[in-house]
Amino acid sequence: MSTSSDVIRMDHLLRLYGPEADGSRDLLRQYAHSMLSDVFPSDGSQRNVENEATLDLLAKVEQWAALMVPANATQRWLQPHILDVSDRIVQEHFTLVKERLDAIPAAL
């Protein structure tokens, strides 16, 4: 899957989780917007997949997913799926960072 489809899936799962997840959904939207701006800068500058602010948003989403306490059977079912998608988003983000770093020529 791609990051964009995982973000959409994560938002869907968080919406199903209930209003307790609204704050995390807001953070996820902020992350998606920030990541889009980092990868496709509107001013034509070089992409910046190492943006600390974007990484912080992603960390907050992941932290919420790890700390949530399900209150019912539906939330208990959703939690591992949310954690799985969250982990994929983190892995995909750091794959982009690694690709960026691998593209930097080594000093001679």
Task: Name these PLM-found stretches.
Residues 1, 97-108:
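Alpha-helical transmembrane segments and their immediate juxtamembrane boundary regions
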Residues 1-9:
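Alpha-helical transmembrane signal-anchor/signal-peptide segments
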Residues 10-101:
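Structured inter-helical modules in multipass membrane proteins
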